[in-house]
Regions:
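Aromatic-residue-lined binding/catalytic grooves and analogous aromatic/hydrophobic interfacial grooves
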Residues: 38, 42
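Conserved small/polar residues in nucleotide/adenosyl-binding loops
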Residues: 109-111
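Surface-exposed patches in mature extracellular/periplasmic domains of secreted proteins
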Residues: 47-55
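Alpha-helical scaffold segments that form or flank carboxylate-/histidine-based iron centers
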Residues: 18-32, 54-80
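Extracellular zinc-dependent metalloprotease catalytic-domain scaffold
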Residues: 72, 97-100
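Membrane-interface helix-loop-helix modules in multi-pass inner-membrane proteins
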Residues: 75, 88-93
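Acidic, low-complexity proline/glycine-rich segments
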Residues: 1-12
């Protein structure tokens, strides 16, 4: 399944009051995140991963531990990370979602 760059859920200047300028968001979303999308799509083209979901690509390429697939894993996982990043930040958001907080605490207990 092709990677698709999601629209930001807010305007590029929406985080200026928190110190993230419109220019920073434009660069980070429109160029940096988009590079993971473009490169990921190039890497999965014509492979077994082309028809898989993003989550299946991440899990499958991580589990495979294949050197040739490291680029696929990196681009897929960074695309996923950035999608979460955009959703978790935004005007009016200040607290960590309770599900994420619980998962983080649980994961730290097992370290």
């Amino acid at each position: 399944m092709a990677f698709i760059l999601p629209d930001l859920p807010y305007a590029h200047d929406a985080l200026a009051e928190f110190g993230m300028s419109a220019e920073t968001l434009e660069y980070h979303h429109d160029l940096h995140h988009n590079a993971y999308v473009v490169n990921g799509n190039k890497l999965i083209a014509g492979t077994e991963w082309e028809s898989k979901s993003l989550e299946d690509i991440i899990i499958g390429t991580y589990d495979a531990k294949a050197v040739a697939q490291n680029g696929i894993f990196n681009n897929a996982s960074q695309h996923w990370n950035h999608m979460q990043f955009w959703e978790m930040m935004g005007p009016g958001k200040s607290a960590m979602p309770s599900e994420l907080e619980a998962a983080l605490i649980l994961s730290l207990i097992h370290i």
